[in-house]
Amino acid sequence: MSKGHSLQDPYLNTLRKEKVGVSIYLVNGIKLQGTIESFDQFVILLKNTVSQMVYKHAISTVVPVRPIRLPSASESEQGDAEPGNA
């Protein structure tokens, strides 16, 4: 994982795993709502009544419907560690 994704990936992953509803605002002002189904380096799959592939370069802001707690660096390192290597 590159340094540019050190906050983005855990944030999106927490929203995905906890199925938190989000409002995604695009750079052209359009507001999309749903839950994050999946994401990669370039896109987010947003599910509402249908699934939409939203390109990250078109996103201005991601707003969750409730506050979320991101795992601390030590928690995420423990979660990423392989058994026997911790």
Swiss-Prot record:
CC terms in the record's Gene Ontology section: cytosol
Domain Sm: 9-68
Subunit structure: Homohexamer.
Family from the record: Belongs to the Hfq family.
Source organism phylogeny: Bacteria, Pseudomonadati, Pseudomonadota, Gammaproteobacteria, Pseudomonadales
InterPro entries according to UniProt: Hfq, LSM_dom_sf, Sm
Annotated source species: Pseudomonas fluorescens (strain ATCC BAA-477 / NRRL B-23932 / Pf-5)
MF terms (GO), sorted A to Z: RNA binding
Gene Ontology terms describing biological process: regulation of DNA-templated transcription; regulation of RNA stability; regulation of translation, ncRNA-mediated
Job of this protein: RNA chaperone that binds small regulatory RNA (sRNAs) and mRNAs to facilitate mRNA translational regulation in response to envelope stress, environmental stress and changes in metabolite concentrations. Also binds with high specificity to tRNAs.
SUPFAM superfamilies, sorted: Sm-like ribonucleoproteins
Entry keywords, A to Z: RNA-binding, Stress response
One family name in Pfam for this protein: Hfq
Signal peptide location: none
Source domain of life: Bacteria
Name under which the protein is recorded: RNA-binding protein Hfq
